[in-house]
């Protein structure tokens, strides 16, 4: 199954990251599983050779540079929408390019993918890039593939890519610090999240003590 393969490879990349292995930050370590999940699927489905895979990465990087220059790509400054959201949008645009779509279709895929993840907060349990980050990479991969399919089918984003990036920046700037990678809000602040932090570190790591 196409989606299950994306799930498998997105998780696998994040497992390597969690075990201190070598990964490529795309655009960050916390979102490093999203692009591999996408690329593994389209490489098989489209029979991409090495050059085509490299073009995929270049296309994704180009869109990522725009986000980095015009907004942000770090969870600490913009929440998870800036990490997995950006990675998903980058992958969607590159998937369209790999499938032979137009530049405009790549832009539409990018806009739809990022729009779908606007507002996603960064709330890592115990401050580690594992829970819920790994599974969010999966969502990023699947979101990218469906956004690419929609763009290739002729669907368009009513809001253009540049404006979606601006909206993401504005949302990120308005997120409270507790929801920007500090591990002090969201899932990290739940009873189970706090218990897991205590289990890992063996002490109260809160800043309020």
UniProtKB/Swiss-Prot annotation:
Keyword Lyase appears in the UniProt entry: yes
Family: Belongs to the iron-sulfur dependent L-serine dehydratase family.
EC number, as in UniProt: 4.3.1.17
Pathway participation: Carbohydrate biosynthesis; gluconeogenesis
The protein's name in its UniProt record: Probable L-serine dehydratase, alpha chain
Cofactors (names): [4Fe-4S] cluster
Cofactor details (free text): Binds 1 [4Fe-4S] cluster.
Listed Pfam families: SDH_alpha
Species annotation: Latilactobacillus sakei
Keywords (A to Z) from UniProt: 4Fe-4S, Gluconeogenesis, Iron, Iron-sulfur, Lyase, Metal-binding
Catalyzed reactions per annotation: L-serine = pyruvate + NH4(+)
GO biological process: gluconeogenesis
């Amino acid at each position: 199954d196409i989606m299950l393969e994306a799930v498998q490879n997105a998780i696998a990349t994040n497992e390597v990251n969690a075990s201190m292995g070598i990964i490529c930050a795309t655009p960050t370590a916390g979102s490093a599983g999203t692009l591999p999940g996408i690329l593994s699927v389209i490489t098989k489905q489209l029979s991409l050779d090495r050059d085509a895979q490299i073009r995929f990465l270049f296309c994704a990087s180009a869109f990522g540079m725009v986000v980095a220059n015009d907004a942000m790509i770090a969870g600490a400054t913009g929440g998870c929408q800036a990490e997995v959201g950006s990675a998903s949008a980058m992958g969607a645009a590159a998937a369209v390019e790999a499938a032979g779509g137009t530049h405009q279709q790549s832009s539409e895929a990018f806009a739809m993918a990022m729009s779908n993840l606007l507002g996603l907060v960064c709330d890592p349990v115990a401050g580690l890039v594992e829970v819920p980050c790994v599974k969010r990479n999966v969502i990023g991969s699947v979101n990218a593939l469906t956004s690419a399919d929609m763009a290739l089918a002729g669907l368009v984003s009513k809001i253009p890519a540049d404006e979606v990036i601006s909206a993401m920046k504005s949302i990120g700037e308005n997120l409270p610090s507790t929801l920007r990678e500090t591990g002090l809000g969201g899932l990290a602040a739940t009873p189970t999240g706090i218990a897991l932090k205590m289990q890992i570190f063996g002490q109260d790591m809160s800043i309020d003590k």
